[in-house]
Amino acid sequence: MAAARLLLRLAGRLESVSFTQSVCGLLGAGQRPGPWHTHCSLERGQLVLSSNPFPGASERLPIQRPLFCPFAALDQQPEVSKTEPLTNRGVDLGVAVILQSSDQTVLLTRRTCTLRISPNLWVPPGGHMEPDEEILECGFRELWEECGLQLPKNQFSCVLLGLWESAYPPRLSWGFPKYHHLILYVLVISQESQEQLQARIQVNPNEVNAFMWLGPDVAAAVVATEDGTRTPGLFSQDLPLSVCATELKDDGGTQPLVLPMPTLMRTTPTTAEEDKERIGAGTKFALQLWLQHLGR
């Protein structure tokens, strides 16, 4: 099946993006840190981006990539991309849902250790956009497939938060990237409480093995770690020492899981061998956008 399409409007022309090209770079990011803003046209199965306004653009969203983005590094090493496989592939589109309860907490899930992409990582529910899908259709499908959640009609609202350029492996020091995604984060604000939502969660054990809810204070501490301004163990005394989560048992039931704060504040390591359970860099960016939406 064909994938949903990502197109860039460059110098007035629509162009596709090859696998090894940095989306942020093509939009004029250069080597300076982001986020930047891009104008977007959102259609069924297609996303068009441009650094300048264009007819049909309906949104202007922040877009970001990690400082260690391998595709930004490849832009500086063009000879590498010519010798590696997968260069004839494009960039896949994904949608991730930041589900906010009426208590102002958001849902994160832990990917199973058997998944090919980003195993053991804490992320919001989400996945690939199919070629015939709208953005919200994709987000709600993934929320159902991963967490068994369907939201009652007229009891939620949605806000497009921003875009994240994602690679896996996430660093060139881990190896040449095998996956290249542009992820659109959608904030879904439910009128139901965390307790009401949690009572209906039934995670898919093939994709998810734990879930948790983060409040603004913990989210702010997590966000502060990615740019190196803090290190694990150095955080406000007002924060809890741990966060309560729910873990899937082998028999299909659930059990409480205590996550120490330093686990949530880990950053992306230099090598794959050092990688441990953590919150993904893209998720930290999404949490930052969520906090901005709350006025934090």
From Swiss-Prot:
PROSITE patterns for the chain: NUDIX
Keyword presence, Magnesium: yes
Residues involved in Mg(2+) binding: 142, 146
Catalytic activity field: a 5'-end (N(7)-methyl 5'-triphosphoguanosine)-ribonucleoside in mRNA + H2O = N(7)-methyl-GDP + a 5'-end phospho-ribonucleoside in mRNA + 2 H(+)
Record keywords, A-Z: Hydrolase, Magnesium, Manganese, Metal-binding
Gene3D superfamilies membership: Nucleoside Triphosphate Pyrophosphohydrolase
Cofactor(s) in the UniProt record: Mg(2+); Mn(2+)
Short sequence motif named Nudix box, residue ranges: 127-148
GO molecular function: hydrolase activity; metal ion binding
Nudix hydrolase domain residues: 90-236
Record-listed E.C. numbers: 3.6.1.62
Described function: Acts as a decapping enzyme capable of hydrolyzing monomethylated capped RNAs (in vitro). Hydrolyzes monomethylated capped RNA after alpha and beta phosphates to form N(7)-methyl-GDP. Shows low activity towards unmethylated capped RNA.
PANTHER family reported in the protein's UniProt record: NUCLEOSIDE DIPHOSPHATE-LINKED MOIETY X MOTIF 17 (PTHR42904:SF1), NUDIX HYDROLASE, NUDC SUBFAMILY (PTHR42904)
Family affiliation: Belongs to the Nudix hydrolase family.
Name of the featured protein: m7GpppN-mRNA hydrolase NUDT17
Organism from which the protein derives: Mus musculus
Gene: Nudt17
